[in-house]
């Protein structure tokens, strides 16, 4: 495939006519919001350092996919991407944005507003406090998705209407060996008027299970494989 959360990944998404892109957000030392999963650049590049301790002017010079390209024996470069660039350049894509750190909610909200991306973004976070902060700032103007807190409630209070302020629930297919996906989880979402998105699902057998209990969205590292599966089973 392509190196995650990079310009190459965005280009690949558009070239293959996909409409949605899930990514994670980190903040640089100088306050820029970039697309990246990890707190450091160690795993994906041949450089080292915490993103929170690096300025954007230095990060943008780094080959963001160097380790991926090395594994694939490819002589290629790609770059990290600012959130504001992703939303403005790829203005037909819908984005699922995961707030990975505290202190970025206001910046993310302003960027979404400035790029007129309110109707094509969904903001999520594993941290209830980060998500609550964003919901307060956006006042429901931008779609949000719950995760850990809402999954716990769904597990132990499955028949209750909880009057959530979110519009979707994102749940893992399996978490630490525990099966999370289920028809009961879908029923909980229906009771609470929530869309259900399941992550991370990468093979046909698990695609089958997701569709059997009626999830509304599948997050995958293998979008081409998922597309072929859907074409075969449409």
Which residues make up each language-model segment?
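Phosphate-group recognition and catalysis centered on beta-loop-alpha active-site segments
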Residues: 1-234
